[in-house]
């Protein structure tokens, strides 16, 4: 899992992504990354076992899958209405925008200056849970399904 928001333009497929529809952006970058890794590793590499997932904006976007639990997970339940207001502006949490000013983490930090991204994001993810993220985020759900289909 990598986020496209901070990904250098030199990553495979990254410069082509903005020309795609939102639904195709991540898939384009994922295909190009997989092809690049496969080319670099050669014939002994099994590309079916490399399953990239590109979060188009930031990890925090996924946490908006359940605004109430996101707020509780960072010990700020009073922020739930504001998180819900952010969430309802977008078709899916994966689409919460990526401007340097309004990126998902910046939205959280604007409401809660003490937000500590690595620690609190992890705690919130536990509260939000995979079921909510999979239900609300088609790209994440698809990635999880591809991982589940891998044979061990």
Predicted regions and their residues:
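C-terminal accessory helical subdomains adjacent to catalytic cores in phosphodiester-
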Residues: 3-152
